Structures are given as structure tokens and as C-alpha cells.
């Protein structure tokens, strides 16, 4: 009986070996490997798409943050320079006040009128100063093309080269932005 058991065990082992080597099993193994390779390709493809999508998402987030920052800066600039158009409109009237105040008063009534104009002029300047408007200094300063507009050149030994000799029209700045440059005569 032991012999018979040994024989049955050997037959089972041979059957298992034959089963493992049969063409059907080898096809299944190839199919499993092919299926595994296809699944791996699909995983790799999905990983690439995920990486691309993550990159695109990060770029969109960065673009949105830049947009928010730009909008905030534009809003701050609009708030900072909100009075620019009003100031630009008032400057010619201010110039006319200054020209009118240069007239010499001969009688008391004219002197009184000039005093009233000077008070209004001073109040206008104070209101503009509160908004951040300042007069651009010109005479005796070095010519700065950002703040001055040269309309004449002269040679004057009393002034340095490239210095402003005379101012024909005052220039104004609103905070750090030039509203109107000074019209000046510059030494060569």
C-alpha cells in the first residue's frame, strides 16, 4: 500500500507539472503579463495626466494671485490719485489767480479786492496741500526732465551748468506723481 501511495503522489506531482507547462497556462500567464503591462501603461498615462493637471492648477492659482495683487494695486493707485483730474482742472484757475495778484493796486478798493483774492488763493493752496499736492521747486535746482520742461536755454555764469535759471509756469506733483511739469529756462 505504501507503494501505491507513492505512485499516486508521483502521478499528482506529474499532473501538476504538466498542468503548469501546458500551453493553456502559458497563454494565461502571457495574458496576465500583457494585462499587467496594459494596466501599468494606463497607470503611467493617468499619472502623467495628473501631473499635468496639478501643474496647470498651480499655474492658474498663481495667475489668480497675480490678478488679485494687480487689482489691489490698481485700487490703491486709484484711491491715492483720485484727486488728479480735479487738481488738473483747478491748476489753470490757480495760475490766473497768481497772475491777477501781480497787478499793482492803486486805490483802496483794488487793494481790498487783491487781499480777498490772496485769501482765496491761500485757501486753494491749503486744500490742495491737504490732498497731497505740492509745488515743484525749480529755480536754482538742477534740471530734472521728470519734473521740468525746458522751453529755453541761456548761458549765465551765475548758475551752474544744467541749472534752472527761471520758471515761467509752476509745476505741481500729486503725492509722487507729476501732474504738470514746471516750464523753465535752463543754463547751458
Curated annotation (Swiss-Prot):
UniProt keyword Chaperone present: yes
GO BP annotation list: protein folding
Compartments it resides in: Cytoplasm
GO molecular function: adenyl-nucleotide exchange factor activity; protein homodimerization activity; protein-folding chaperone binding; unfolded protein binding
Region annotation Disordered: where it falls in the sequence: 1-31
Keywords tagged on the record: Chaperone, Cytoplasm, Stress response
Entry's Gene Ontology cellular component terms: cytoplasm
Extent of Basic and acidic residues compositional bias: 1-16
Record's keyword annotation contains Chloroplast: no
Main location: cytoplasm
PROSITE patterns registered for this protein in UniProt: GRPE (PS01071)
Family: Belongs to the GrpE family.
Function: Participates actively in the response to hyperosmotic and heat shock by preventing the aggregation of stress-denatured proteins, in association with DnaK and GrpE. It is the nucleotide exchange factor for DnaK and may function as a thermosensor. Unfolded proteins bind initially to DnaJ; upon interaction with the DnaJ-bound protein, DnaK hydrolyzes its bound ATP, resulting in the formation of a stable complex. GrpE releases ADP from DnaK; ATP binding to DnaK triggers the release of the substrate protein, thus completing the reaction cycle.
Subunit structure: Homodimer.
Name of the featured protein: Protein GrpE
Source organism phylogeny: Bacteria, Bacillati, Bacillota, Bacilli, Bacillales
Gene for this chain: grpE
Amino acid at each position: 500500500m505504501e507503494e501505491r501511495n507513492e505512485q499516486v503522489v508521483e502521478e499528482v506531482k506529474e499532473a501538476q507539472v504538466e498542468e503548469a507547462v501546458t500551453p493553456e497556462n502559458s497563454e494565461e500567464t502571457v495574458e496576465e503579463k500583457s494585462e499587467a503591462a496594459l494596466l501599468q501603461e494606463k497607470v503611467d498615462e493617468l499619472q502623467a495626466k495628473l501631473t499635468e493637471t496639478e501643474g496647470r492648477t498651480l499655474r492658474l492659482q498663481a495667475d489668480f494671485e497675480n490678478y488679485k495683487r494687480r487689482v489691489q494695486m490698481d485700487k490703491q493707485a486709484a484711491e491715492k490719485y483720485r484727486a488728479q483730474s480735479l487738481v488738473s482742472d483747478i491748476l489753470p484757475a490757480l495760475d490766473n489767480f497768481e497772475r491777477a495778484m501781480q497787478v499793482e493796486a492803486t486805490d483802496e478798493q483794488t487793494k481790498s479786492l487783491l487781499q480777498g483774492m490772496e485769501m482765496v488763493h491761500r485757501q486753494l493752496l491749503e486744500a490742495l496741500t491737504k490732498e497731497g499736492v505740492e509745488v515743484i521747486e525749480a529755480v536754482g535746482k538742477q534740471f530734472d526732465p521728470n519734473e521740468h520742461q525746458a522751453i529755453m536755454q541761456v548761458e549765465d555764469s551765475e548758475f551752474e551748468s544744467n541749472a534752472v535759471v527761471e520758471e515761467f509756469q509752476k509745476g505741481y506733483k500729486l503725492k509722487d506723481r507729476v501732474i504738470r511739469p514746471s516750464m523753465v529756462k535752463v543754463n547751458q
